[in-house]
Amino acid sequence: MSLMIEVLREPWADEAIPLPSYATVGAAGADLRANLPPEIRDQGVEIQPLCRVIVPTGLRVAIPAGYEMQIRPRSGLALKHGLSLPNTPGTIDSDYRGPLGVLLTVIGTEAVTLHHGDRIAQAVIAPVVQAVFAPVDRLEETARGAGGFGSTGRG
């Protein structure tokens, strides 16, 4: 299945940086790349442990109604450098037209420097269902009941 996502580059964005793309035929996530403003392209962006930084992609997108774009971490960056998204998955709504930035943090012990053009996250397009929330006097009973975190055990 294919869906068209309109992409607009920011006026300052480097056109040599590829638009989001899928690395393999079966990939669910399209790679997003750092597209840094001209004044910091040479030095990159350093993220200190436990700090948060919004890394620009230089893009704006138009997601079709009925869909969202989920921004997810890249597993290799998480494993090798402790780089993750504190709000994973980040949600880009279909009516948002602002700059697409990726909120990143380092959960490791060493700073990470991201360079212009680095793959920094993945974008997954997913359908959206808007529910109707209805007040009720009671909820139907289930076998699980009110058991919350860890209540279903291990294994």
UniProtKB/Swiss-Prot annotation:
Its cofactor is Mg(2+). It comes from the Bacteria. The keyword Hydrolase applies. Pathway: Pyrimidine metabolism; dUMP biosynthesis; dUMP from dCTP (dUTP route): step 2/2. It is an enzyme of class 3 (hydrolase). SUPFAM superfamilies: dUTPase-like. It catalyses: dUTP + H2O = dUMP + diphosphate + H(+). CDD domains: trimeric_dUTPase. Substrate binds at R74, S75, G76, N87, T91, I92, D93. Pfam families: dUTPase. GO terms for biological process: dUMP biosynthetic process; dUTP catabolic process. Its EC number is 3.6.1.23. GO terms for molecular function: dUTP diphosphatase activity; magnesium ion binding. Signal peptide: none annotated. Keywords: Hydrolase, Magnesium, Metal-binding, Nucleotide metabolism. InterPro entries: dUTPase (IPR008181), dUTPase-like (IPR029054), dUTPase-like_sf (IPR036157), dUTPase_trimeric (IPR033704). This enzyme is involved in nucleotide metabolism: it produces dUMP, the immediate precursor of thymidine nucleotides and it decreases the intracellular concentration of dUTP so that uracil cannot be incorporated into DNA. Belongs to the dUTPase family. This is Deoxyuridine 5'-triphosphate nucleotidohydrolase. The gene is dut.
